[in-house]
Structure formats: C-alpha cells, structure tokens
C-alpha cells in the first residue's frame, strides 16, 4: 500500500518543472539574493506608493497619472507573479513548480507584457493630445476614453495570454524538465519540448510582430508629431516643458520594447540561456524599480504630492 503511494507520488513529482533561478551558478549567491530581495522591496514600495499618491491626491487625477498608476499596477503584478517564488525557492531549496503553477505564471506574464505594451501606446497618444492638441485635450482624453483605453489594453493582453499559454503547455516535455529561467517563460519552456515546435515558434514570432507593430506605430507617430511641433516652437521654455513631459515615457518605452524585441523576436541562436535570464531579470525586476523613480524624481507634481502627504501625516501625528 505504502509502495503504491510512493510510486504515485514519484510519478506526480516527475511532472513538475525545475526553475534554475538567478542564483544557481553564482559564487556569491547570498549577496545576489540580498540585492534581489532589496530590489524587490524597493519596487513594491515605490509602485505601491505611486499608486497611493495618484489616487489620494486630487491634483494627480489627470489622464497622464491615471495611465501611470495602471503601469505601476502592472509592475506590481509582474513582481508578485515571478519574484516571490524564486526568493522562497532559494531559501527552502524547493525550486520545483507544478505544470498548473507554470501555466498560471506564464498566463499572467504574457497578459501583463501584452497589456503594458498597449498601455505605453495609449500613454504616447495621451502625450500627443496634450502637446499637439491642447484645446481639444479635455474632449480627446476624457474619463470615459481613458477607461476604455485601459480596458482595451487589459483585454488585448489577456487575449495574448489565453492564446499562447494553453498551446505552449500542451506540448509534451519528455526531456529534461529543468527550465533555464527563474519563471515559466515561453521561449525557455519551448526548449524542453521533445516535439517539433518550429511551426509554433514561427506563429509566436508573427504574434509578437502583430502585438508590437501597432503600439510601435502609435508611439512613433505620436512622438514624430510631438518633435515636429517642438522644433517649430519659438519659446525655449515651451520646448523644455514639452520635452520633459515626454522624456520619462520614452525611457520606459525603450527599456520595455528593447527587452521584448531581444527575448521574443531575436533568433535564439544569437543569445544564450544565461543572457536570456539576465534580460528577463532586467525587465521583471529592474524596470519596476526604475519606473517609479523615473516618473517621480523627474516630476514636480509627484514630488509635491509626496511632500504634501508626508506633511499631512506628520501633522496628524502631532
């Protein structure tokens, strides 16, 4: 009876995947773990604080900050889907993940990645409307339009996750079940399949092109028009204000699209599994740390709102 149960448990365990993690081959695993944990806490605190500020401060109830709060929410979810499992696994020594857990991780990762790409396009259109169409801005970017744009971003991201996750998880994995990543990422998982996935890889590549092409067109068109208007401005102060309004967003666009292009569109023969893991760590851990810093330190409205909130809290304590 016990023997039968043990066999059943071994068979069940054999279906689990093993995540390599960031610390597997490192000689300074403890130091790397500490740095990752601190970055995780910084990202959680920074994005949560940014969301709290935007929703509690009436002066920040504008379309631009509404989109920034959604970006911060996506970054928070990104972190919570991928990083805690890796950190806990390093402490407990259990780096395994079940197929269902792997599928859930992959679905949320694809959903959030897709939604964030479209959200950046919506933010670029918002900047175009603010800089190039200031008189029509209240009409073009009213509350209903902003809510519809954000809802569309989430829906399109979910479509991406619902399309790719079931197909990826349906492939047989009869070779090593060791995923060379710290979370269940589609390219890393496909390398474990013992069936021919060349057609699916091509379809995934085309899907990525479609997912990235529309946002890239919107973003590039918006900023081309903005730069054209800035070039025609006579006022140096007006130029600086317009550039400051858009520069923060452009930094985030370059970071995310660069990482997405590298991971999903560059041929796998041009990069190693270790390089893939570093890029994944960059846009999963480092970018959520940078986003609040970029949008707060470079933004007088946010810093003013933060000082106001801290002063009100101090007055309440007195």
Curated annotation (Swiss-Prot):
What residue ranges lie in the Extracellular compartment? 1-30, 85-105, 164-200, 265-277
Gene3D superfamilies assigned: Rhodopsin 7-helix transmembrane proteins (1.20.1070.10)
Q: Which residues form the signal peptide?
A: none
What does the UniProt record say this protein does? Answer: Odorant receptor.
Keywords, A to Z, come to:
Cell membrane, Disulfide bond, G-protein coupled receptor, Glycoprotein, Membrane, Olfaction, Receptor, Sensory transduction, Transducer, Transmembrane, Transmembrane helix
Q: Which residues lie on this side of the membrane: Cytoplasmic?
A: 55-62, 126-144, 225-241, 298-318
GO BP, one example?
Answer: detection of chemical stimulus involved in sensory perception of smell
User: InterPro entries this protein is in?
Assistant: GPCR_Rhodpsn, GPCR_Rhodpsn_7TM, Olfact_rcpt
Q: List locations, semicolon-separated.
A: Cell membrane
* Membrane topology type: Multi-pass membrane protein
Source species taxonomy = Eukaryota, Metazoa, Chordata, Craniata, Vertebrata
Instruction: List, in alphabetical order, the Gene Ontology terms for molecular function in this entry.
Output: G protein-coupled receptor activity; olfactory receptor activity
Give the transmembrane region(s). Answer: 31-54, 63-84, 106-125, 145-163, 201-224, 242-264, 278-297
Q: Which PANTHER family match?
A: OLFACTORY RECEPTOR (PTHR26453)
Name of the protein in question: Olfactory receptor 2T34
One cellular component (GO) term of this entry: plasma membrane
Query: Which residues does the annotation flag as glycosylated?
Result: 5, 10
Similarity comment: family membership: Belongs to the G-protein coupled receptor 1 family.
Q: In this UniProt entry, which cysteines form S-S bonds?
A: 102-194
């Amino acid at each position: 009876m016990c023997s039968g149960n043990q066999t059943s448990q071994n068979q069940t365990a054999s279906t689990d995947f093993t995540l390599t993690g960031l610390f597997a081959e490192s000689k300074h695993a403890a130091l790397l773990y500490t740095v990752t944990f601190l970055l995780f806490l910084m990202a959680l605190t920074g994005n949560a604080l940014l969301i709290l500020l935007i929703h509690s401060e009436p002066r920040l109830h504008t379309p631009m900050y509404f989109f920034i709060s959604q970006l911060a929410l996506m970054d928070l979810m990104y972190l919570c889907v991928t990083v805690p499992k890796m950190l806990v696994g390093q402490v407990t020594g259990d780096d395994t993940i079940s197929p269902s857990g792997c599928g859930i991780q992959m679905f949320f990762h694809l959903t959030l990645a897709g939604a964030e790409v479209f959200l950046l396009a919506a933010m670029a259109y918002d900047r175009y409307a603010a800089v190039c169409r200031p008189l029509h801005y209240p009409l073009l970017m009213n509350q209903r339009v902003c809510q519809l744009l954000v809802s569309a971003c989430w829906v399109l991201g979910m479509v991406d996750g619902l399309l790719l996750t079931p197909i990826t998880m349906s492939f047989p994995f009869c070779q090593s079940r060791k995923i060379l990543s710290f979370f269940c990422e589609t390219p890393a998982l496909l390398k474990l399949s013992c069936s021919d996935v060349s057609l699916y890889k091509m379809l995934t590549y085309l899907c990525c092109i479609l997912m990235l092409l529309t946002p890239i067109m919107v973003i590039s068109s918006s900023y081309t028009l903005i730069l054209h208007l800035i070039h025609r401005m006579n006022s140096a102060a007006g130029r600086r204000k317009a550039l400051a309004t858009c520069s923060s967003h452009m930094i985030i666009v370059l970071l995310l699209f660069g990482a997405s292009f590298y991971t999903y569109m560059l041929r796998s023969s041009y990069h190693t599994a270790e390089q893939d893991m570093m890029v994944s760590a960059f846009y999963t851990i480092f970018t959520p740390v940078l986003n609040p810093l970029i949008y707060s330190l470079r933004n007088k409205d946010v810093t003013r709102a933060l000082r106001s909130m801290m002063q009100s809290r101090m007055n309440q304590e007195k």
